[in-house]
Amino acid sequence: MYHYAGNNPVRYTDPDGCFLEVTDNGDGTYVISGGAVNSDKNIYVVDDSGNRTGILGQMLTENSFFDEGALVIGAIIDTSDASGSEFLGNFENNTPDIFSYINNARNGKIYDFKDLGKGNLKGNELNKYRHRGMQLGIDENGNKIFGSARDVGNYAAGYVAGKSGLYWIEARLGFDAYQSFKSRRFCSEGAATQAAQRLGFTAGQNSSQGKPVTNYRLMRMQMMQYR
């Protein structure tokens, strides 16, 4: 299992968020059935009467299974799905340079994790597929951390930006520029996208490669100020 955030996910997870409710299919998969925005990021298992019977784990970000603030009802969390953790583990060990990433992260490309294997899905079924859930780590208290396929791709985007030595404002401008290009209007990415990107960015910036690059840029800036 890939433990994001340097084997310490609590360092980079968001402190506040939403709660989520799921129903148990009895085969290791859970269907998202309810949820709301508040400070509780727990994923509660509920029975057919809506009574809470346990806690599956916690969400990676406050919006992991929400799309533009709307709960993606019917999306499936598969506790046996290791594809996201494997993707991020490989991405961390074989991080592409930022230009290679940009060329291969567009819709349908190899780094567009949310759409890998989507087939001919469209509309709401495609949206549920993009928000399919999987375990991405375990926090210091032993709680399982679950994220969506969309989270995985956005985390990777932030990671490569942070590891490349970009500042957050630079990365944010790039992400929003691409979103504006796709939307054919000036706009910013949504809260769900930004939250996962920021977690990945922090992890990338604090990686063994990201730290020296960032420190070098800071040193250069300080030198320029004293000229």
Residue ranges and their predicted role:
Residues M1, G153-A157, T193, L199:
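Membrane-active amphipathic alpha-helices enriched in small hydrophobic residues
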Residues M1-D67:
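Short turn/helix-capping motifs enriched in Asx and small/polar residues
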Residues T61-R185:
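Hydrophobic alpha-helical bundle signature of multipass membrane enzymes
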Residues D16-G17, Y159-E170, T202-Q209:
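Catalytic Zn2+-binding segment of zinc metalloproteases
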Residues A171-R227:
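Active-site or metal-binding loop neighborhoods of secreted/extracellular toxin and effector enzymes
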